[in-house]
């Protein structure tokens, strides 16, 4: 027998619905006259859109932007989240209105990074933060892209990468002789860590430390947890549930800080302000001589947070970029051959490629840009927040509003790229194929924009170029016939590809 609801039950249900609707409306900020709130889909009570986002939020939000526009709003739990798409809209927010959108949200996962003192993840955005960011940028540039007077290389970065690329070539050859194949990521990660370690710590960076190797090979724990949309940041009860992922994230951050603190302390023991040879030395010198005004002088305990940011910026992004590059090239052998033909013509085989060759190697540069664009391995920037009430595209955005920047959508916008899902490096070349199309190259979004743009962007681009140039000059990369390479991204702060242990590398000529 069917049971029909009574009038009392219907009345109670209607009352409950109205109460929930009233509470939700009461939480929403008042919108000034003449403006409107950003549009977006209705979400589930209490949950919001967390189930809608699924395992690939960048794809879901890109589809929603087609319906609701470049400025849309969702909820994760009870937290409203502004989602920005479209290059013009994102530039307007992060560049033209950069002061309005330069904040960082106070998220739980961010508080676990260097105990909440990270320059990149902390909610600080005032004068002290700006001064320390400039200091970190200056120190990074000095010991990476600035010239090295004690070396024949053009800069510190070229010197470090050239040495590590040679070591990587040797390891790949040994792996081929012993096993017959290798996993690119596990081989590249050590070389990239040694490069940024040498720039940060010089001779103090350990070469064969088990602690270092353990941290390097477990770095995926960080990107698997510090991503846009992590439920632990929106449902506070999850902070008290000891899930394995959260426990590993806490442990990894603690171990990394302890590792860096130990190296910095050793560095301090023999510090000589008249003989500065690395980033840590430059920061220690600034501690002694800097002014306290506007945060210009930093306390010793803050050095570890700056070094953590620099080390992270120069490590994970570059490792992921090179690993993706090799996977794209084994699945597109004709593109790999074109790069190698260009290297043979411009560089030859008698010497190694150098950073000064970049302008003469446009096809390699175009291929790197296309790998950045097509993979979009950093799908979102680190989340932003508004620093004050503002407007964007006619929509009212209140202060302290959480903001997601969908870089994946920008890099796959059909209005910009025409055929965004085709892997075609040639799109970035000028009509005569001799140079990079600067206007189009600046539309690739991978390092953010504006006041929070990644301080290691130039370093990362140069490092990826030089590693790939040296590797591709010497080796031909492939997979055995019948092996299918899975290029499906695994979502995270940086997206990894499915690990492949079947990559092979053979000398293109006698390696000297």
From Swiss-Prot:
Claim: Iron is one of the keywords in the record: yes
Molecular function in Gene Ontology: caffeine oxidase activity; demethylase activity; enzyme binding; estrogen 16-alpha-hydroxylase activity; estrogen 2-hydroxylase activity; heme binding; hydroperoxy icosatetraenoate dehydratase activity; iron ion binding
Binding site for heme: 454
Classification of source organism: Eukaryota, Metazoa, Chordata, Craniata, Vertebrata
Localization, UniProt: Endoplasmic reticulum membrane; Microsome membrane
Keyword Repressor recorded: no
Pfam families assigned to the protein according to its UniProt record, in alphabetical order: p450 (PF00067)
Catalysed reactions, as listed in the record: an organic molecule + reduced [NADPH--hemoprotein reductase] + O2 = an alcohol + oxidized [NADPH--hemoprotein reductase] + H2O + H(+); 17beta-estradiol + reduced [NADPH--hemoprotein reductase] + O2 = 2-hydroxy-17beta-estradiol + oxidized [NADPH--hemoprotein reductase] + H2O + H(+); 17beta-estradiol + reduced [NADPH--hemoprotein reductase] + O2 = 4-hydroxy-17beta-estradiol + oxidized [NADPH--hemoprotein reductase] + H2O + H(+); estrone + reduced [NADPH--hemoprotein reductase] + O2 = 2-hydroxyestrone + oxidized [NADPH--hemoprotein reductase] + H2O + H(+)
Listed cofactors: heme
GO terms for biological process, alphabetical: alkaloid metabolic process; arachidonate metabolic process; cellular respiration; cellular response to cadmium ion; cholesterol metabolic process; dibenzo-p-dioxin metabolic process; estrogen metabolic process; hydrogen peroxide biosynthetic process
Functional note: A cytochrome P450 monooxygenase involved in the metabolism of various endogenous substrates, including fatty acids, steroid hormones and vitamins. Mechanistically, uses molecular oxygen inserting one oxygen atom into a substrate, and reducing the second into a water molecule, with two electrons provided by NADPH via cytochrome P450 reductase (NADPH--hemoprotein reductase). Catalyzes the hydroxylation of carbon-hydrogen bonds. Exhibits high catalytic activity for the formation of hydroxyestrogens from estrone (E1) and 17beta-estradiol (E2), namely 2-hydroxy E1 and E2.
Pathways per UniProt: Cofactor metabolism; retinol metabolism; Steroid metabolism; cholesterol metabolism; Lipid metabolism; arachidonate metabolism
UniProt subunit comment: Interacts with PGRMC1; the interaction requires PGRMC1 homodimerization.
UniProt membrane topology term: Peripheral membrane protein
EC number: 1.14.14.1, 4.2.1.152
Keyword field: Endoplasmic reticulum, Fatty acid metabolism, Glycoprotein, Heme, Iron, Lipid metabolism, Lyase, Membrane, Metal-binding, Microsome, Monooxygenase, Oxidoreductase, Steroid metabolism, Sterol metabolism
Classification via InterPro entries: Cyt_P450, Cyt_P450_CS, Cyt_P450_E_grp-I, Cyt_P450_E_grp-I_CYP1, Cyt_P450_sf
Family (UniProt): Belongs to the cytochrome P450 family.
GO cellular component terms listed in the entry, alphabetical order: endoplasmic reticulum membrane; intracellular membrane-bounded organelle
Positions of glycan attachment: 65
Binding site for substrate: 222
Name of the protein: Cytochrome P450 1A2
